[in-house]
């Protein structure tokens, strides 16, 4: 083969019309042909080696993984509920994704189909669309990056301030802490509202229900509580700080916007997260929002911090859950609610807890709100939530329209565990006040029928009227605990018994201004000691007496 190629090369090198070829010319042609063949051989060897290395690299770097997805198809869609065929291995409460990009959650796992609730507008889904599993249970972003933001039930920002920067996510349906990690409530959660902090005190880790008819001031108590935490969050002591989560369920968008503006004006948004599932959102989002907010609060609790979560209100969550359950063909029970509506709220509220020091010592306090119809607390949802929580603040329409605001019914309101967390100073001044007010309400009902009352009854009525006036408080004006103690001291010790009831509010404003400007050291002692010492008691008595002597109503 080699000789043939050499001969061909020599022939090409010879002149075409050569008569006689010299030996030198023939020799040089042969040498040139041999050199050409050697260079070609070297090129072939180099190309083969390079090709082999490229192929080897590609084989070693090839992605051998196979991307498998379990999919199903929509059988029917309507009223926010999709019936999906396939998805045989889907989990309960797993997130699924429709071909339109919408997300949903599998709730009903039936033999031949899966009932999926849609998180959004079901008009974007049609029969026959592909649905794929995500393999993930519904989760939301958590962390301090959410503070100051307004998010929807899935944790997506809806305040126009860009995406959430949180890298931590947490499942929305986590189990509540067990018995061992918990410890009894022992630290006060101050609302800044005199009537609450003195009569129905709340502790960190407690669940205190706010219940009443519409337009009786339920949300106002919650918002005042958030605003009052500014005095603690402005400090540097992490143990005193209280991060707040407000969950708006089924409210008007304008109402949520006003609330966010109010918190922003009070400089309270910097430590608050607002989770909004408004009336125009799908029922599944209204159902999910409280659990999403709770997961955000649990992040603080489990990291040794303190958080407060307000569910406003759980009546609307129960209605959304009833709607979903009936559309999923689950059997209805009392008031058409499904049989597990108690579990709906208990598994949510049990996640509020005070953790012991081995588990970080954090806490999550819950203030659920329930709206009653015509003051009926014996309805299904109110009785359920009353039995789950550690007490309730009961607001009455009648008191509200009488001008007693906050319109708290002292007789029906109770805090089952909060007294252990109440500051000693407040216990010293307000210990007898609840009994006095309850007796006053009872006697006042009979006093209108008779005029000849004995001196003790007249004294009880006189004191009750003045204490009721003293507990009135304007909206968005929470008070520090030491200021509350100073004002209530004047009332329960009888210094205001001679003052006209109509002058009580004026006295309170003037007295507080005087104490704050002239006796800051006394307030500081009460705040730091947590109690009224003998010296502080004597000083308070002197201040009240001297102020009343010069007070001109």
Curated annotation (Swiss-Prot):
Q: Where in the cell is it found?
A: Mitochondrion inner membrane; Cell membrane
* Membrane disposition: Peripheral membrane protein
The record, for SUPFAM superfamilies, names:
C-terminal domain of alpha and beta subunits of F1 ATP synthase, N-terminal domain of alpha and beta subunits of F1 ATP synthase, P-loop containing nucleoside triphosphate hydrolases
Is this entry keyworded NADP? no
Name the residues that bind Mg(2+).
219, 312
- A UniProt-annotated Pfam family: ATP-synt_ab_C
* Site label Required for activity, positions: 413
Q: How is it modified after translation?
A: Acetylated on lysine residues. BLOC1S1 is required for acetylation. Acetylation of Lys-132, Lys-230 and Lys-498 is observed in liver mitochondria from fasted mice but not from fed mice.
Q: Which UniProt keywords apply?
A: Acetylation, ATP synthesis, ATP-binding, Cell membrane, CF(1), Glycoprotein, Hydrogen ion transport, Ion transport, Magnesium, Membrane, Metal-binding, Methylation, Mitochondrion, Mitochondrion inner membrane, Nucleotide-binding, Phosphoprotein, Transit peptide, Transport
Q: One biological process GO term for this chain?
A: cellular response to dexamethasone stimulus
GO-annotated molecular function: ADP binding; angiostatin binding; ATP binding; ATP hydrolysis activity; MHC class I protein binding; protease binding; proton-transporting ATP synthase activity, rotational mechanism
- Mind telling me which GO cellular component terms the entry cites? cell surface; membrane; membrane raft; mitochondrial inner membrane; mitochondrion; myelin sheath; plasma membrane; proton-transporting ATP synthase complex
**Where in the sequence is Phosphoserine found?**
53, 65, 76, 106, 166, 184, 521
Q: Please name every pair of cysteines joined by a disulfide bond in this record.
A: none
Where are the N6-succinyllysine modifications? 161, 167, 230, 239, 261, 305, 427, 498, 506, 531, 539
Q: Which residues carry this modification: Omega-N-methylarginine?
A: 204
- Glycan-bearing residues: 76
Q: Which residues carry this modification: Phosphothreonine?
A: 134
Give any extra note attached to this record. The siderophore enterobactin (Ent) produced by enteric bacteria binds Fe(3+) and helps bacteria scavenge iron ions from the environment. As a consequence, the mammalian siderocalin LCN2 plays an important role in defense against bacterial infections by sequestering iron bound to microbial siderophores. LCN2 can also bind iron bound to endogenous or nutrient-derived iron chelators and plays an important role in cellular iron homeostasis.
Query: Could you tell me which HAMAP family the record lists for this protein?
Result: ATP_synth_alpha_bact
User: How is this protein organized at the quaternary level?
Assistant: Homotrimer. Component of the ATP synthase complex composed at least of ATP5F1A/subunit alpha, ATP5F1B/subunit beta, ATP5MC1/subunit c (homooctomer), MT-ATP6/subunit a, MT-ATP8/subunit 8, ATP5ME/subunit e, ATP5MF/subunit f, ATP5MG/subunit g, ATP5MK/subunit k, ATP5MJ/subunit j, ATP5F1C/subunit gamma, ATP5F1D/subunit delta, ATP5F1E/subunit epsilon, ATP5PF/subunit F6, ATP5PB/subunit b, ATP5PD/subunit d, ATP5PO/subunit OSCP.
- Report the protein name in the record: ATP synthase F(1) complex subunit alpha, mitochondrial
- What species was this sequence derived from? Mus musculus (Mouse)
Q: Which gene encodes it?
A: Atp5f1a
């Amino acid at each position: 083969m080699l000789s043939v190629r050499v001969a061909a090369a020599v022939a090409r090198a010879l002149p075409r019309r050569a008569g006689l070829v010299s030996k030198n010319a023939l020799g040089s042609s042969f040498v040139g042909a041999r050199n050409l063949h050697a260079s070609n051989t070297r090129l072939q060897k180099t190309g083969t080696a390079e090709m082999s290395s490229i192929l080897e690299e590609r084989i070693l770097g090839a992605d051998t993984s196979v991307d498998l997805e379990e999919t199903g198809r929509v059988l029917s869609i309507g009223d926010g509920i999709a019936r999906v065929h396939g998805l045989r291995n889907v989990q309960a409460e797993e997130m699924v994704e429709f071909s339109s990009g919408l997300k949903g959650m599998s709730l009903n796992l039936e033999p031949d189909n899966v009932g999926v609730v849609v998180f959004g507008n079901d008009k974007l889904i049609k029969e026959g669309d592909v649905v794929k599993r995500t393999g993930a249970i519904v989760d939301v972003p958590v962390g301090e990056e959410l503070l100051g933001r307004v998010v929807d039930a899935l944790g997506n920002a809806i305040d126009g301030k860009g995406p959430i920067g949180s890298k931590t996510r947490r499942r929305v349906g986590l189990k509540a802490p067990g018995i061992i990690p918990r410890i009894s409530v022992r630290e006060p959660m101050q609302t800044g509202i005199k009537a609450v902090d003195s009569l129905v005190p709340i502790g960190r880790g407690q669940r205190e229900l706010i219940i009443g008819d519409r337009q009786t001031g339920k949300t106002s108590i919650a918002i005042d509580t958030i605003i009052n935490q500014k005095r603690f969050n402005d400090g540097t002591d992490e143990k005193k700080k209280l991060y707040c989560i407000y969950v708006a369920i089924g409210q008007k968008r304008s109402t949520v916007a006003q609330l966010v503006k109010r918190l922003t004006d009070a400089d309270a948004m910097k430590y608050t997260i607002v989770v909004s599932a408004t009336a125009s959102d799908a029922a599944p989002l209204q159902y999910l929002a409280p659990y999403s907010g709770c997961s955000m609060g649990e992040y603080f609790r489990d990291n040794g911090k303190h958080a407060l979560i307000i569910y406003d209100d759980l009546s609307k969550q129960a209605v959304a859950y009833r709607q979903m359950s009936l559309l999923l063909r689950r059997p209805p029970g009392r008031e058409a609610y499904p049989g597990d509506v108690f579990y709906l709220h208990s598994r949510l509220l049990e996640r509020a807890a005070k953790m012991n020091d081995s588990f970080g010592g954090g806490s999550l306090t819950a203030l659920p709100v329930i709206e009653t119809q015509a003051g009926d607390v014996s309805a299904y949802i109110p009785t359920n939530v009353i039995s789950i929580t550690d007490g309730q603040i009961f607001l009455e329409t009648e008191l509200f329209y009488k001008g007693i605001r906050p319109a708290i019914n002292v007789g029906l309101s109770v805090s089952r565990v909060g007294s252990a967390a109440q500051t000693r100073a407040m216990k010293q001044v307000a210990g007898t006040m609840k009994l006095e007010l309850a007796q006053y309400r009872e006697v006042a009902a009979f006093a209108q029928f008779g005029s000849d009352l004995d001196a003790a009854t007249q004294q009880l009525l006189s004191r009750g009227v003045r204490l009721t006036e003293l507990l009135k408080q304007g909206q968005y004006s929470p008070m520090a605990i030491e200021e509350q103690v100073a004002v209530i001291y004047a009332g329960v010790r009888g210094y205001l018994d001679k003052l006209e009831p109509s002058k009580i509010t004026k006295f309170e404003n003037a007295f507080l201004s005087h104490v704050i400007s002239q006796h800051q050291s006394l307030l500081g002692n009460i705040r730091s000691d947590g109690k009224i010492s003998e010296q502080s008691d004597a000083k308070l008595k002197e201040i009240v007496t001297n102020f009343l002597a010069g007070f001109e109503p």
